[in-house]
Amino acid sequence: MAKLRDYYKSHVVYDLMREFKYKSVMQVPKINKITISMGVGKSIINKKFLERAIEDLEMISGQKPVITKARKSIASFKIRQGQEIGCKVTLRRKRMWEFFERLISIAIPRIRDFRGLSIKSFDGYGNYTMGIREQIIFPEINYDTIDGIRGMNITITTNAVSDKEAYVLLRAFRFPLKNNDSIYTSTEEH
């Protein structure tokens, strides 16, 4: 079992109950799922780019990705409706907690020139999306075997009612959000 899940149940729930004055444990926000997606624009030219992206995403997540297709044709991007343009994977339960732990403790510290993640990436509904420029920050990817650098989007979906609740939830896990943006910081001291 993932350590972060145990930490959430033993510490985070009670800290958030105290801070937001929830009456029930069920009101405390939690992470529902993590979605990782890769858009592979080069797959229009060569299908091998998409195959390699699928392999990379499968190694990173531990789960087989789903191929995403274009919803409509866009001439300027040279894509047609139904054309395979990327892949995504949705992690829940055990795999979600394991990935979240690896993301916080291993992958994010390996980002070059890292100064914290922006808090402007909250969507207004308590979900957080971050972009990663290089897949090589994950230890599962062998640097010698990659054919190119690919980025990805990681969306952390919570059941928090507001961005402030989601911010406090992610900070409770020591998620490296920038401190200088203090619009979500609590008025109470811990």
UniProtKB/Swiss-Prot annotation:
One of its GO terms (cellular component) is ribosome. GO terms for biological process: translation. Coiled coil: none annotated. Keywords: Ribonucleoprotein, Ribosomal protein, RNA-binding, rRNA-binding, tRNA-binding. SUPFAM superfamilies: RL5-like (SSF55282). InterPro entries: Ribosomal_uL5, Ribosomal_uL5_bac-type, Ribosomal_uL5_C, Ribosomal_uL5_CS, Ribosomal_uL5_dom_sf, Ribosomal_uL5_N. GO terms for molecular function: rRNA binding; structural constituent of ribosome; tRNA binding. The keyword Ubl conjugation does not apply. It comes from the Bacteria. NCBIfam families: PRK00010.1. Part of the 50S ribosomal subunit; part of the 5S rRNA/L5/L18/L25 subcomplex. Contacts the 5S rRNA and the P site tRNA. Forms a bridge to the 30S subunit in the 70S ribosome. PANTHER family: 60S RIBOSOMAL PROTEIN L11-RELATED. Belongs to the universal ribosomal protein uL5 family. This is one of the proteins that bind and probably mediate the attachment of the 5S RNA into the large ribosomal subunit, where it forms part of the central protuberance. In the 70S ribosome it contacts protein S13 of the 30S subunit (bridge B1b), connecting the 2 subunits; this bridge is implicated in subunit movement. Contacts the P site tRNA; the 5S rRNA and some of its associated proteins might help stabilize positioning of ribosome-bound tRNAs. This is Large ribosomal subunit protein uL5. It comes from Blochmanniella floridana.
